[in-house]
From Swiss-Prot:
Keywords: Endoplasmic reticulum, Heme, Iron, Membrane, Metal-binding, Microsome, Monooxygenase, Oxidoreductase. It comes from Helicoverpa armigera (Cotton bollworm). It comes from the Eukaryota. Its cofactor is heme. Its EC number is 1.14.14.1. This is Cytochrome P450 6B7. It is found in: Endoplasmic reticulum membrane; Microsome membrane. The gene is CYP6B7. Its main location: endoplasmic reticulum. GO terms for molecular function: heme binding; iron ion binding; oxidoreductase activity, acting on paired donors, with incorporation or reduction of molecular oxygen, reduced flavin or flavoprotein as one donor, and incorporation of one atom of oxygen. PROSITE patterns: CYTOCHROME_P450.
Length: 504
């Protein structure tokens, strides 16, 4: 008899689930904020949740759908959030009214690696930022430059040997060997040769941290749930690996700086200075002891930021040089002249002072901003200036750098690679919010100077010895890998690397 009731039960269940997973979908309509129509369960993230498109591409598409709106109401799964398009509003959120949007809002267990500068919020973030910002000053990076230089020389030797066997390279994986070497040396004081037995482990770590976990979608649907359950988005094997690595290094150095001027030395110097404190009036006084766990968390985020983002940016830069030989010719001429002026050496100042190289780098980041989207959480109710729209406390605010960087209102022919966009005169004409590869304001990327320096050094070294040419397998229409957390090339990037003395 119960079989007769089964259709009715299923119907009730389906209707109940439908109502539950659409219960918030009138949120923005009630506030007269336009936005794309959400899909049951997925909200506006169906393609990224199913790993059909990268989240950065999805955000760009939503940005483009509403060219005349200052803000766009959307849904991450069932949770309402706001995509901001207007520069005036972006500037208020990121700079002028920073205290109302100081948190990134990525909420999960802050035990282990979770207590890192990127994911920390509130006064914990402020305390970490105040203490760790000096690590990335120009002076500190200059002292660390010799470590990068050693890694770059070893990398060029490796490429030279490989060029004796072949011309075509998949440059993304190739450049990861350079950034792995540099980060291992600059962060942990470990030479690449001595960690060759750990390369396989590092590759596993890279795969895990470069591909999104569905824990992210769970956080979208049920904000704060991961934190309440004390769950982390960082897998346990990754946490164990970095804890073991950092513990061994601290033990080898007896908990004291070893005179290498690397990241670990600088952190151990900070620990000798005592607790990290913050006395911002909003939250009273917060003290944070620099424990081994805190050190491990910062080393983790330093590795992730410097390893993957730099390798990907350089890969895209080399890709564009292969397709734009006129740009490459001009850049090689600048590199040759700069090295000649430095008595045949590549110094810190050599790299920093090459204007065209820096413009090429900036244009690469315009076309391929690696971290998408930028995210902030409202710490209080906030009325958007000049509107009746109120962003309620705990609402996520998103910004699409890629959407902005490809907007023809700000960049003519945005799909064309043109480093001259970054002539000083051209930059002066644009709003500062028109270029956001590293974010903006106090929560911009603290390691951007390091990433930029190691990348510019490597490109300089490469072009001093080689030319980049398209190969028969160079994809003229690169797609973005949908499964990665960051923007990255689907299927890699294949080009020919040719010693300059035998240019074809």
């Amino acid at each position: 008899m119960w079989v007769l009731y089964l259709p009715a039960v299923l119907s009730v269940l389906i209707v109940t689930l439908y109502l539950y997973f659409t219960r918030t979908f009138n949120y923005w309509k009630k506030r007269n904020v336009r936005g794309p129509e959400p899909t049951v369960f997925f909200g506006n993230l169906k393609d990224s949740t199913l790993r059909k498109k990268n989240i950065g591409i999805v955000m760009e598409e939503i940005y483009n759908q509403f060219p005349y709106e200052k803000v766009v109401g959307m849904y991450r799964m069932t949770t309402p959030c706001l995509l901001v398009r207007d520069f005036h509003v972006i500037k208020h959120i990121m700079i002028k009214d920073f205290e109302a949007f100081r948190d990134r809002g990525v909420e999960f267990s802050k035990e282990g690696l979770g207590q890192n500068l990127f994911h920390a919020d509130g006064e914990t973030w402020r305390a970490l930022r105040n203490r760790f910002t000096p690590i990335f000053t120009s002076g500190k990076l200059k002292n660390m430059f010799y470590l990068m230089h050693e890694g770059a020389d070893n990398f060029i030797d490796h490429v030279s040997k490989e060029c004796e066997k072949k011309q075509e390279f998949e440059v993304h994986s190739l450049l990861q060997t350079y950034t792995m070497s540099t980060i291992s040396s600059c962060a942990f004081g470990v030479s690449y040769n001595s960690i060759s037995d750990k390369v396989q482990t590092l590759e596993i770590v890279d795969k895990i941290i470069s591909e999104p976990s569905y824990a992210i979608e769970l956080d979208y649907m049920y904000p704060k749930l991961l934190a309440k359950l004390n769950l982390s988005i960082i897998p346990t094997p990754v946490q164990h690996f970095f804890k073991s690595l950092v513990d061994n290094i601290i033990s080898q150095r007896n908990g004291k700086p070893a005179g290498r001027n690397d990241f670990m030395d600088l952190i151990l110097e900070l620990r000798q200075m005592g607790e990290v404190t913050s006395n911002k009036y909003l939250d009273g006084v917060t003290s944070l002891e620099i424990t081994d766990e805190v050190i491990c968390a910062q080393a983790f985020v330093f590795y992730v930021a410097g390893y993957e983002t730099s390798a990907t940016t350089m890969s895209y830069l080399i890709y564009q040089l292969s397709l734009n030989q006129d740009v490459q010719n001009k850049l090689i001429a600048e590199v040759d002249e700069a090295i000649k002026a430095s008595d045949g050496k590549v110094t810190y100042d050599t790299v920093k002072e090459m204007k065209y190289l820096n413009k090429v780098f900036d244009e690469t980041l315009r076309m391929y901003s690696i971290v998408e989207p930028l995210q902030r959480k409202a710490t209080r109710d906030y009325q958007i200036p000049g509107t009746d729209v109120v962003i309620e406390k705990d609402t996520m605010v998103l910004i699409s750098p890629r959407g902005i960087h490809y907007d023809p209102k700000y960049y003519d022919n945005p799909k064309q690679f043109n480093p001259d966009r970054f002539d000083a005169e051209e930059v002066g004409k644009r709003h500062p919010c028109a270029y956001l590869p590293f974010g903006l304001g106090q929560r911009n990327c603290i390691g951007m100077r390091f990433g930029r320096l190691q990348s510019l050094l490597c490109i300089t070294k490469i072009l001093s010895k080689f030319r980049i040419e398209p190969s028969k397998n160079t994809d003229r229409n690169l797609q973005v890998e949908p499964r990665r957390v960051t923007i990255g090339p689907k299927g890699g990037i294949r080009v020919n690397i040719v010693p300059r003395k035998i240019v074809s």
